[in-house]
Amino acid sequence: MRGFVLTALALAAVWPSSGIEQLTRVDVSLGDVSINKVPQLVAADQGLYAKHGLDVHQTISAGAARAAAASGVVVPDAYVNRDASAAAPIEVGGGSPMINGFVNNARGAARVIVLTQEAMAMDHIIARPGIAGIQDLKGKRIGFSGVGSVTHFSALRLARQLGWSPDREITLVAGSANLDALKQGKVDAILASAMVIALAPQAGFKDIGDLTAYKMPMAGSGIMVDKAYLAAHRDTVLRFLKADIESTALMQRDRRVFNAALGKWFNIADARTQDGMFAHVKKFEKKPYPSVDGIKQVFAIYDSPEMRRHRPEEFYDSSLVAELDKSGFLDNPK
């Protein structure tokens, strides 16, 4: 697969509709390379950041770049943030790993979830030939990305749903939620999001199950903000949310915009693959309030003395989406 350029400089030639003549610089971490980041790329391509008065600079982490390469997606080095100490105030990623990182790592960023696009577990399970369905995973090795990650949460929550012990009846393998792990025989199946799901058939692997059917609440992909930054720059964060929500709505009603983004950034031009990925986009929340039920599930799945020192309310702020909802923006995002 050709490398793709991950850039998100807003179009300076497009003046924001609010009449503001100077764009506000915002640094954003996209976390990983996945379909959940397409709204941000579309927002840049279509001038939506600039429309809302923002000059957005987006990067992904070095670890995410390595993970993407393991499934055939190569990110140019210029767009990889290798300075882990330079944390962006706004992050697009999973709420579950954010909460785990803060609770279990003294250096974890004090962030709150302000928007959730994936309020239910939506990963699929991709398996090697010979495994017909999810029930056949008992006794097998299942790959996930890392402890506390969305794929780890999904694996543990699925095991609980099926009445399996994750310590005795399945083997969870960290750092293996990619096609290379399947190709090399390190695992029998992996938890995968839309990007890997789309690439799996051509690699000879089968999609054996969609976790959406289990209706498991989750603090999945969304927007998280440093608490201090939010307190000082609430209007900037609100404008970022407006650009994100408007971009998502644009993708959902205009397949050409979505298809163009897939072709440009991910080199995915196959119509069948695009159709499958668009089905995932159509599941994005119309009113993306922070997933409170999902956050509570994080506390339940990762119960520990340290986790019990915190409360779910520490990790979300619904007021921004509520403000946009009350104004009518969520019903007519433009």
PLM feature spans:
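Bacterial N-terminal signal peptides
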Residues: 6-14
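Periplasmic-binding protein-like
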Residues: 30, 117-127, 203-233, 241-244, ...
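Short, glycine-/small- and polar/acidic-enriched structural segments
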Residues: 22-174, 181, 188-194, 208-211, ...
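Secondary-structure end/capping motifs
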Residues: 232-309
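Positively charged n-region of N-terminal signal peptides that target proteins for export
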Residues: 1-4
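Conserved C-terminal helix/tail region of periplasmic/extracytoplasmic solute-binding proteins
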Residues: 303-334
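Pocket-lining segment of extracytoplasmic ligand-binding domains
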Residues: 96, 167, 177-265
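N-terminal signal peptide c-region/cleavage motif recognized by signal peptidases
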Residues: 16-18
